[in-house]
Amino acid sequence: MQKVAIVGRPNVGKSSLFNRLVGRREAVVADFPGVTRDAKEGLMLYHNHRIVLVDTGGLWSGDEWEQAIREKAEWAMEGAQAVIFVVDPREGLTAADYEVADWLRRLGKPVIVAANKIDSPKHDVYLAELWGLGFGDPVAISAEHARGLDDLMERVMAHLPADEEDVPEVAPIRISLIGRPNVGKSSLLNAITQSERAIVADQPGTTRDSLDVEWNYGGQRFVLVDTAGIRKKPDTAIEEYAIQRSEAAIERSDIIWLVVNATEIGDHELKLANLAYDSGKPVIVVVNKWDLVPDEALKQTEKELNQKLHHIAYAPRVYTSAINDYGIHDMLAEAMKLYEKWQSRIPTAELNRWLEIWQMRQAVPNFHGKPLKMYFMTQVETAPPTFAIFCNRADFVTRAYEGFLQNRIREDLGLAGIPVRLKWKEKGPYKKGKKGEEAEA
């Protein structure tokens, strides 16, 4: 597959161009320099060609992240057949632009200069200075207004090898890593991929954007999404927007890894568990930094986890140490098992045999001598498995009984570890004027 890297100094519009070419708002975009720190991959289609685009952090930023960002950019350049060098001619070339140009010449990749923020032909007067970069004729574009993008891609395609037309592929399993800042999400991602794809530091909030990384495990393709750490109260507008991007990444995911710090479990984990619960996606609780828990504190740590995460008690737990590579493969293996269950469908005949036996063996809610009667059960959706149960009185179903029933469905019907939804449909003389209720767990 063809690969193209997008580079440039901070705040020239690299992420805006990346988002425009990929076709959805993947990277955090704001008027603050240095918003993107990690190298982010996305897939674009151009005239039946699949191209991997890599959006890199702002180079020569002059801050504490400069060296780490440049190392990530150099990693992103490996395997790239061409480079889009984004500049802001309206602001004029800076010392950082020339530093980036010298760096690109040393790497020896084909370079196309994209003169961004040229919103109309009258701004073309700013282009003359760009010849001094030494990469030939620049392409005038506006990522914000989609101007000049075809011209840019034609120049890019001239440097790419011939590629076969797209062949339909099995969709990868998308997994989001969520957690509060500094619990080790990026370290886990790096441990899984055996590379330094995400910047890791002791300072909370290092990851500001949702970072997508493709990976293959056991013949299964994955897209691993390292999201920004979610705080109780965001400190800045950028953090607020990054949280929104994290929530959007969760919405597009198939599986959620809820990463918690084994040495520091608090009320914030409850909020994140609620977020995962509400998504209806399978959740794996990844208890990271497990190696730092003393033996005498193991039982207390488990007790705290049970208390904070009681409403997702069905979710499996994996105990990990990103530093020691402990439990890393278990995360992916468990995700594959849950994904298969999440997509499963149970025959109606099997469901109703189970329902009949259940009602014979187990007491049902009873109000004023009138018992709840469940007549029929069928699966109406997958991902997550959703079951409609036809009964005489939906209002007889208490929350406790419903949760109990959902747990038995998981255990008895091979759905352990995943969320299950129930829809109650009334049938019979009490149906008139009553509404079926829907529950989720």
UniProtKB/Swiss-Prot annotation:
Keyword hit for Nucleotide-binding: yes
Annotated GTP 1 binding sites: 8-15, 55-59, 116-119
Keyword Aminoacyl-tRNA synthetase in annotation: no
Keywords: GTP-binding, Nucleotide-binding, Repeat, Ribosome biogenesis
Domain KH-like: 344-428
Xref: CDD domains: EngA1, EngA2
Molecular function GO terms recorded: GTP binding; ribosome binding
Domain EngA-type G: 2-164, 173-343
GO BP terms, alphabetized: ribosome biogenesis
Binding site for GTP 2: 179-186, 226-230, 288-291
Pfam families (alphabetical): KH_dom-like, MMR_HSR1
Signal sequence, renumbered to the chain: none
InterPro entries per record: G_ENGA, GTP-bd, GTPase_Der, KH_dom-like, KH_dom-like_a/b, P-loop_NTPase, Small_GTP-bd
Quaternary structure (record): Associates with the 50S ribosomal subunit.
Family statement drawn from the similarity comment of this UniProt entry: Belongs to the TRAFAC class TrmE-Era-EngA-EngB-Septin-like GTPase superfamily. EngA (Der) GTPase family.
Function: GTPase that plays an essential role in the late steps of ribosome biogenesis.
NCBIfam families reported in the protein's UniProt record: GTPase_EngA, small_GTP
Protein name: GTPase Der
Organism: Deinococcus geothermalis (strain DSM 11300 / CIP 105573 / AG-3a)
Gene: der
